[in-house]
Each structure stands twice: as C-alpha cells, then as structure tokens.
C-alpha cells in the first residue's frame, strides 16, 4: 500500500457576509504535489473547533496515517511555551496549535515519522518543550539577514550551513546549501529530544532532527516551493520522509 501522509490544515479566517461561518480548510498545494509525485497519498486532516475533542481526534487520525507532515502556516500561540504575545506576533490559531501538538505526541507514541517545514519545525519544537523567537527582528540581536524575504518562494535567497554527519548533510551531499526564506519566527530554546543540524549565516536555526531516533526531521525553509523549478534536489527531504516511513512500517 502507498504511504498515507497526514497533513494538518489551515483555515481561511475571513468575514464572509453570505456565509459567515464558512472557513475553508486547506493545505499547501506544493506539499501535496511533492508527495503525489513520489507515490504517496496525501490525506488532509482538519482540526476541530471544540478543543475537548482534540486528543481523541488526534489519536484517531494517527491510526489512519503512516507519517505526519507539519507544513508552514500562521505563528504559534506563545501560550504553548509560557510567554505573553509580542507586539509583532502575527495571526495565531489556538485550536490548530493544540491539535498539532496532540498529533505530534500521538505520532511519536505510535512510532510514526514526522516531517516539518517552517511553522512545522516550530510547532514540533514547542510540543517538545522548546520556545520560539516570536519576532526575529525585535528579539534576535545577531540578526544579519532578512528572513521574511519579499520575493517569490521558488527562489533561494540565503545560505544554510549543515552540520557534518547530520541527516541533512547526508541528504544534500554537502555542507552548505542555498534556500528560500519566508519566516519571522524561529526556534529559540531547543525542545527535548531534538538537536539543531542547520543554521543560517547569522545563527538562526534552519534545521532540526531527533537526537536518538530517526522519527523527526524539520527545516525552516520551504523545499516544497523550490523542487518544481529552481532546485529539484529539494525533493530529497520528502523522499527521506517516505524512506523513514517505509523503515517503520516493516
């Protein structure tokens, strides 16, 4: 059977005078296309409004999937790492954060691999007890490059250093790569069971992996926006996710 990839949704929160309660749920198009190209089945999974149903629903979803993919999206609510909201924090969705945290814990308990992109690496870090810079420009003194780049997502804008011997370095086959950049938040204190394996020139965390297992790999950039045109090699992180799933299904 083809691997089934669970992808949590975002919701489009806008006032619609015709259908005021119609909040379309969606997942990133290029993420879906990457998995289809590689022979996997993307399953879009939506979060409930009622947070009392989150834990059971997360357990039910994890039984249906072979791996959990955490895509980009809105900022993570700082409530989940014990902070007040910074003046420059963007939109947050409490139910989404609560749901994805439950999905992460359920997936790890079921020995099912996780792959995170952008917000995905951030919510994984928070779920494991880590913290975030709520706004790099305001809170990160060593900032030297623009991380929320104002350009098309398929184009690389800055370099990333990959840790020698890390999964990321092995996948890309070199110690430095060039990536796109579409974020204003980043990993601060690293969560339990995680390690940093990629950094930007100014030290901002760009990649993380599990310390003792192969269950998690995450990147801060958006490989899904680059593989179709500018950098086909960016598919390697998607293929690695499927390879990890295959290993855990045996």
Walk through the language-model features, giving the residues of each.
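N-terminal beta1-alpha1 cap of cysteine-dependent amidohydrolase-like domains
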Residues: 1-115, 126, 137-171, 176-178, ...
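Conserved G/P- and acidic residue-centered "switch" motifs that form tight phosphate/ATP-binding loops
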Residues: 118
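The feature captures the ABC ATPase H-loop/switch
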Residues: 121
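Post-Walker A helix-loop "phosphate-sensing" segment adjacent to the P-loop in P-loop NTPases
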Residues: 129-133
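Active-site-proximal beta-strand elements of phosphoester/diester hydrolases
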Residues: 217-220
